UniProtKB/Swiss-Prot annotation:
Name this protein carries in UniProt: Chorismate synthase
Cofactor: FMNH2
Chain residues that bind FMN: R144, A145, S146, G307, K322, P323, T324, P325, T326, R349
One Pfam family here: Chorismate_synt
Source organism: Acetivibrio thermocellus (strain ATCC 27405 / DSM 1237 / JCM 9322 / NBRC 103400 / NCIMB 10682 / NRRL B-4536 / VPI 7372) (Clostridium thermocellum)
Cofactor binding comment, as recorded: Reduced FMN (FMNH(2)).
EC numbers for this chain: 4.2.3.5
The gene coding this protein: aroC
Length: 394
């Protein structure tokens, strides 16, 4: 398996499976080493304050079992930093290594997954994993295709956050739609910050959030699931990040976000709305702002990126999140060993929607991508000393 690393200078590598301990419990090793998720973060500068509590705060946002709308599966997602940080919680410049042990290694939930190992679960990666890895694929809890894999990303994203915080760059994500119930349009950064995590689904529109929550309760009773939309805003990103051809900033961010299993669509700024506008309406008008001493834009339909390069305005992204594929309603599928068409009812613990737990994963991946782009941009400018310095002020 390849493709477990993201980034060029600020590089994140993850490994581990959802329920690795289920295989290793009979080995003569301590229970703590049965299995878990690991994140290795390379390119972390020295001198950054980084505590396990700081990383844990991010992990707790996506941890299951916190509310009645979550899967009831209990995982502490407790993180341990085992390298790259000294006793004073200051980074050394060496790779930061983190492990999140699997608490749940043998229970009814895992046993049910084992009983389904021969069949393809609709909407999941079972069939494609069979085609690519055959009988050797980890088929308990979807292995590397499991949503639990994202816990390692969130841990790595917390490291990126610790660095970005020193630069005044903030990334915030929130739910704007659940199963067709939409929050108000154009939620501002200020509104999102003021109402951040004020309800179980992290929707800044507090009134619409009530409708969304009731819908999720109804869907959960049915044993079904629904999708939705998550929006991400990055504030404080300087102009100049990204490359103009194959490595456009929006391409890097799309790579980061579309690598999350449940994400099925993405748009920046006005996105598909540009198809309904004239050029005179679509264009963001630039002007010199004396108060800030730099060029600003009267609107932000571009979503903070022009020509593949950040323009200094808020970067705004929306992603489409598909329904949780594992549901309790009987579904038709295929037994890959007998090649029989069968019907299976997946009575395992699942979320009625992934949206309330995926937003911290979106935050993490955007932070990782932005910090990597920032490193590249700063390195490029450092060796381009013949560029007129006045442009740096704008």
């Amino acid at each position: 398996m390849v493709g477990n690393t993201f980034g060029r200078i600020f590089r994140v590598t993850t490994c581990g499976e959802s329920y690795a301990g289920a295989f290793r419990k009979n080995l003569q090793i301590p229970k703590e080493l049965f299995g878990g998720l690991i994140a290795i973060v390379d390119g972390v500068p020295p001198g950054i304050k980084l505590t396990a509590d700081f990383v844990q705060e991010e992990l707790d946002k996506r941890r299951p079992g916190k509310t009645p709308l979550d899967t009831p599966r209990k995982e502490r997602d407790k993180v341990y930093i085992f390298s790259g940080v000294m006793e004073d919680d200051i980074t050394t410049g060496a790779p930061v290594g983190m492990i999140i042990p699997n608490d749940v290694i043998e229970d009814e939930h895992i046993n049910k997954h084992k009983s389904y190992k021969e069949v393809v679960r609709p909407g999941q990666a079972g069939y494609t994993f069979f085609k690519k890895y055959g009988q050797f694929a980890d088929n308990i809890g979807a292995g590397r295709a499991s949503g639990r894999e994202t816990a390692a990303r969130v841990a790595a994203g917390a490291v990126a956050k610790a660095v970005l915080d020193t630069m005044g760059i903030d990334v915030i994500a929130f739910v704007t739609e659940i199963h067709g119930i939409k929050a108000q349009e154009n939620i501002t950064y200020e509104m999102a910050k003021a109402n951040y995590r004020k309800n179980e689904i992290n929707c800044p529109d507090l009134e619409k959030a009530k409708e969304m929550i009731e819908e999720l309760k109804r869907i959960k009773e049915e044993g079904d699931s629904v999708g939705g939309v998550v929006e991400i805003i990055a504030r404080g990103v300087p102009a100049g990040l990204g490359e103009p051809v194959f490595d456009k900033l929006q391409a890097t961010l799309a790579h980061a976000l579309m690598s999350i299993g449940a994400i099925k669509g993405i748009e920046f700024g006005e996105g598909f709305g540009h198809t309904k506008l004239k050029g005179s309406e679509s264009n963001d008008v630039p002007y010199y702002d004396e108060a800030s001493g730099r060029v600003r834009f009267k609107t932000n339909r571009a979503g903070g990126i022009l020509g593949g390069i950040s323009n200094g305005e808020d970067i705004r992204i929306r992603v489409a999140v598909k329904p949780t594929p594992t549901i309790s309603i009987p579904q038709k599928t295929v037994n890959m060993y007998t090649l029989e068409n069968v019907e299976v009812e997946f009575n395992t613990r699942n979320d009625p929607s992934i949206c309330p737990r995926i937003y911290p994963v979106c935050e993490a991946m955007v932070r990782i991508a932005l910090l990597d782009a920032l490193y590249i941009a700063k390195g490029y400018r450092a060796i381009s000393s013949n560029i007129d310095p006045r442009w740096d002020r704008l």
